[in-house]
Regions:
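Catalytic histidine-centered segment of alpha/beta-hydrolase-like enzymes
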Residues: 269-280
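An N-terminal hydrophobic leader/cap segment in hydrolases
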Residues: 1-52, 62, 323-333, 354
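Short alpha-helix in the alpha/beta-hydrolase fold that links the catalytic acid
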Residues: 232, 246-254
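Short beta-strand/loop motif that positions the catalytic acidic residue
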Residues: 229-231, 236-238, 242
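Alpha/beta-hydrolase active-site loop
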Residues: 120-141
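Conserved alpha/beta-hydrolase
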Residues: 97-116
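The serine-hydrolase catalytic nucleophile loop
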Residues: 83-96
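Hydrolase active-site cap/lid region
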Residues: 160-216, 225
Length: 379
């Protein structure tokens, strides 16, 4: 094999991995924080579980709830993270949900964090995993109404799933993409202005490789087609300056969304930025409005305590770093800065690859890919 051909093959490998095998957020487990802690003088516990995904992969997950329940049934929000992220991301929502007496469920989706699985599917397989999570929560004593809060891939996953299940009562969709093929074209043109025929050829080859490895036609992933059938109240969130998923994706979904809806745009930050306090407050009020109702009867007594757990909670809030203003984010900012450096390097590599691809490269690669697919189909 010639040096040029090896370079092109390496280039395509980087491109398809960027979509279904982004850098894994292999976080230190102590970043989950203490399993018992206090927030606003109230004791909480984190209970860890292993769920089995639709494809048979282990998914580490956690439920965060108060030690002494204010009611027999408490609402819970399932947080669905982004594509190169993990359940760690969901901890950012605790200060939004806990003051409203809403529990939080976080999970490492397959191919992410400490879960099993080699690839992600940007919402296709993950949407089936949401059903497994909902079934699990329904079978836990004390589960009230269930909501979904998803970001990026997680937002599109939530949109794909929600209309299938009446048990989901409310949605927060932060930075969803409407159609993956459109998103891929936009990202390609953003980094380098290639002719349409080259972009089409690149996407065709990458799509074929992804289908061979993951079994899905990634460029037919179209979350927006589920929006019209959705019926749950939803709050959409998007950064105006999001360079990864343009604001028009959220606007397009919002315009045809079938349920009660509102759109909150952030003028601060971009795709992965922390949302302004005014928006997180609105999200908290939104979930309280739609998840706290007569199904969650308030009944404060000893029977509502999780007596089977011996709690040695953190008395000094500084030790809990999840809630201490700045402490948690100091750890995460350092961690995120390293991730952002890697992501920038990946995008720079991709840009160089795209600049060196020509029509002959696409033709050769497409012929070889079709040949491999035919051989596999015969097997």
């Amino acid at each position: 094999m010639e040096k040029g051909e090896t370079k092109i093959k390496l280039g395509y490998e980087i491109l398809w991995k960027f979509i279904i095998r982004p850098p894994r957020d292999d976080y230190p487990l102590n970043y989950l924080g203490p399993s018992q802690f206090k927030y606003n003088s109230k004791a909480y516990i984190r209970r860890d579980f292993i769920l089995i995904s639709h494809q048979g992969y282990k998914m580490p997950s956690s439920l965060i709830e108060p030690l002494s329940r204010p009611c027999k049934k408490m609402p819970v929000v399932i947080y669905l993270h982004g594509n190169a992220s993990s359940r760690l991301e969901g901890l950012n929502t605790l200060s939004t949900l806990l003051p409203h007496n809403i529990n939080l469920f976080i999970v490492d989706l397959p191919g992410c964090g400490h879960s099993e699985g080699d690839y992600i599917s940007l919402g296709y397989y993950e949407s089936y995993d949401v059903g497994i999570i909902v079934d699990f929560l329904e079978n836990l004593p004390g589960t009230g109404n269930i909501g979904i809060w998803g970001r990026s891939m997680g937002a599109s996953t939530g949109l794909i799933y929600a209309h299938r299940d009446k048990r989901i009562k409310a949605l927060c969709l932060d930075s969803p993409f409407a159609n993956f093929c459109r998103l891929a074209r936009e990202l390609t043109k953003q980094y380098i202005n290639l002719p349409d025929f080259i972009i089409n050829g690149i996407l065709k080859i990458i799509g074929g490789t992804i289908k061979e490895k993951n079994g899905i036609d990634i460029f037919r992933l179209n979350p927006i087609e589920e929006a019209e059938n959705a019926f749950q109240p939803a709050i959409f969130v998007h950064a105006i300056n999001d360079k990864l998923i343009n604001l028009h994706h959220a606007i397009d979904i919002f315009n045809i969304y079938g349920g009660e809806k509102s759109l909150k745009c952030s003028e601060i930050g971009g795709h992965n930025s922390k949302r302004p306090k005014r928006i997180t407050q609105e999200i908290g009020n939104f979930f309280e409005k739609y998840l706290q109702n007569n199904n969650n009867e308030f009944d404060i007594n000893e029977d509502n305590k999780l007596n089977e757990y011996k709690i040695n909670y953190v008395n000094d809030l500084n030790q809990s770093f999840v809630f201490k203003s700045g402490e948690y984010y100091k750890n995460r900012e350092l961690y995120n800065s390293l991730k952002e450096e890697n992501e920038k390097k990946n995008m720079d590599d991709i840009k160089k690859i795209l600049l060196n691809i020509n029509e002959n490269d696409i033709s050769k690669e497409s012929t070889e890919l079709n040949s491999n697919i035919s051989i596999n189909e015969k097997k």
